[in-house]
Every structure is written in structure tokens, then in C-alpha cells.
């Protein structure tokens, strides 16, 4: 009688999809104007999530916490105490 020697080797059968392999798009947060720079009213100064930087003089805060200039002037990033920062816009005085 013939003996048949069958051997089955380990093999990878089904290939599932991976759960990684995706990345979210960047939100472009951060400073949009530098300290000492001249800005016009309505210019965006800082895009943020939450209040990393607080609005100072002549600066408004939008619904998504974006800081914007209310008047034309010079941008100043300042400290409020030890651990808080604020951004202000100081109007330029025109000489006649």
C-alpha cells in the first residue's frame, strides 16, 4: 500500500484592513501677525482653540476664539502676570 505524506504549512489566508493609516489636516492655528507689526481693523491676529492668549486693548474675540484687531494700529503681545498672555493693538497717533 502507498503511504501519502501530506504536510500543510502555515500560510496567511485572509488579509483584513488596517485601522491606522490616516491623518487629519492641519488647522493652521497660531500667530498671524508679529509683535510691532502694523495692522488694519478686522485683521486676524491669532487663531487658537480656547483662550491660550487673551484679548487686550482694541482686540476682539470671535466665536472660535480667534483674536482680531478692532482698530488700525501696532500689535503688542504682552504678559498678564506670570502665566497669562494677551495681545493688544495700540492706535498710531497721526501728527497734523
Curated annotation (Swiss-Prot):
HAMAP family: Ribosomal_bL27 (MF_00539). Residues 1-9 form a propeptide. The keyword GTP-binding does not apply. The gene is rpmA. The N-terminus is cleaved by ribosomal processing cysteine protease Prp. GO terms for cellular component: cytosolic large ribosomal subunit. Keywords: Ribonucleoprotein, Ribosomal protein. One of its GO terms (biological process) is translation. Belongs to the bacterial ribosomal protein bL27 family. The keyword Zinc does not apply. This is Large ribosomal subunit protein bL27. It comes from the Bacteria.
